Amino acid sequence: PLGVFAARNTSPHLVLYHCIRNVLNLMRALPELVWALVFVSAVGLGPLPGVMALIFVTTGFLGKFLAESIEVVDVNGVMGVKSTGAGWLQTLTFAVFPLALPDFIGTVLYILDHNVRAATILGLVGAGGIGYELVMSMRLFNYGRLILIVAAIYIVVTILDRFSNVIRSRVI
């Protein structure tokens, strides 16, 4: 929904457009690592602040990228649906979303890939997860476990990349 309201051509009101854009800018203004530190100080150590930071920043980026995808959809397709008497919601459902779907999917898959890597970094600040295990292995000089963790991260990223290619080939 934030992407729809942050797109100039689908936002129902200019004030709402600017408010949502500013909220998305705030969410993206700081990297996940900084938001994780903020959330660690608010809720303590563990995986929750890392998840909160990823959700916060991801929402900001997805909202912006999806709004930009919506803003560049083919005007002729949208006008064709509007010419049938379709309202705002029907225009979104039958023109804007189908035209923007390939960009949406590409963006979501990229963000998913990015978040897997970002989750590793968040462990450095005590936000839990595989990043924490990576740091502990380094601190304890447990290089066998360190190599295993790096290999696991590589395998997950590779699987996500292949999954992304399959999805893109079916949709785009």
Residue map of PLM features:
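Hydrophobic alpha-helical segments of membrane proteins
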Residues: L30, V34-V38, A100, F104-L112, ...
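Generic hydrophobic transmembrane alpha-helix motif, especially the helices
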Residues: L24-I55
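C-terminal transmembrane helix and the adjacent membrane-cytosol boundary/short C-terminal tail
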Residues: G106-L109, I147-I172
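Membrane-cytosol interface at the C-terminal ends of specific transmembrane alpha-helices
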Residues: L45-V96, P102-H114, R162
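Membrane-helix interface segments
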Residues: N9-Y17, G46-P47, D103, N142
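Cytoplasmic-entry segments and transmembrane alpha-helices of multi-pass inner-membrane transporters
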Residues: L2-A36, F65-E68
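Glycine-rich helix-loop "coupling/hinge" segments at transmembrane-helix boundaries
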Residues: S41, D113, A118-I153, I172
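Short amphipathic alpha-helical coupling elements at transmembrane boundaries
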Residues: H18-R28, E68-S83, F94, V135-R139, ...
